[in-house]
């Protein structure tokens, strides 16, 4: 009996160690409500797009770029340049710009180098900001809400699955949402409202 229990314990442990595979909801409706995304995928390389498959997506991680005034494409091109400069390993699945533009750098089924231990099961979004406060302007903010809500729909998530880089590592990122907890709660609330609207018409 002990042996049987022991074997079961081993079996359960092995089952837990096996992560769920990547899946996403697909439908004409989901495609129709997708925000406008400029797909500018990085060249496959070990420094910013290593081609490592993600597991089942269980969260969305919000970052800020920490380079005030830079555009989404500026940040995308920085990630692209790492294949030559080899300065560090860094990237993001999406970058939201100052005009509300959304640039995709890495497919959601591939791991981006953004959120440390959560790279393997999250989608990362870098967000541009105009000044040192890290506060997002209205165009950026609205696109962040729209993108997060759409990703929640796509991966069966809700606003509580949207987290900050800070929540993973303690890093002050995104700065404004770490320093203003009320603004962070408001953002998550806005994502929830948008998600419910998307679900209404599904």
Positions of PLM-derived features:
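Short, small-residue-biased leader/transition segments that mark boundaries at the very start
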Residues: 1-4
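N-terminal catalytic cores of peptidoglycan-degrading enzymes
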Residues: 8-116
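Basic/polar, cationic surfaces and motifs that engage anionic cell-wall
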Residues: 9-37, 130-202
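Solvent-exposed, acidic/flexible segments
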Residues: 55, 87, 118, 133-141
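Soluble periplasmic/extracytoplasmic beta-strand elements of cell-envelope proteins
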Residues: 61, 124-126, 163
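Cell-envelope and extracellular/periplasmic
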Residues: 65-66, 118, 123-132
């Amino acid at each position: 009996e002990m042996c049987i229990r022991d074997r079961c314990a081993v079996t359960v442990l092995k089952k837990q160690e096996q992560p769920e595979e990547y899946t996403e909801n697909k439908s004409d409706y989901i495609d129709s409500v997708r925000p406008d995304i400029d797909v500018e995928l990085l060249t496959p390389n070990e420094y910013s797009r290593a081609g490592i498959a993600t597991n089942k997506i269980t969260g969305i991680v919000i970052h800020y770029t920490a380079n005030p005034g830079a555009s989404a494409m500026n940040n995308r091109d920085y990630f692209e340049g790492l294949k030559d400069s080899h300065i560090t390993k860094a990237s993001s699945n999406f970058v939201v710009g100052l005009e509300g533009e959304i640039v995709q750098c890495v497919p959601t089924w591939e791991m981006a180098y953004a959120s440390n231990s959560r790279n393997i099961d999250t989608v990362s979004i870098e967000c541009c900001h105009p000044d040192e406060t890290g506060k997002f302007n209205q165009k950026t903010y609205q696109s962040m809400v729209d993108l997060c809500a759409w990703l929640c729909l796509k991966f069966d998530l809700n606003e509580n699955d949207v987290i900050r880089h800070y929540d993973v590592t303690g890093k002050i990122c995104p700065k404004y949402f770490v320093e203003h907890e009320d603004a962070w709660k408001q953002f998550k609330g806005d994502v929830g409202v948008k998600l419910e609207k998307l679900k209404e018409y599904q």
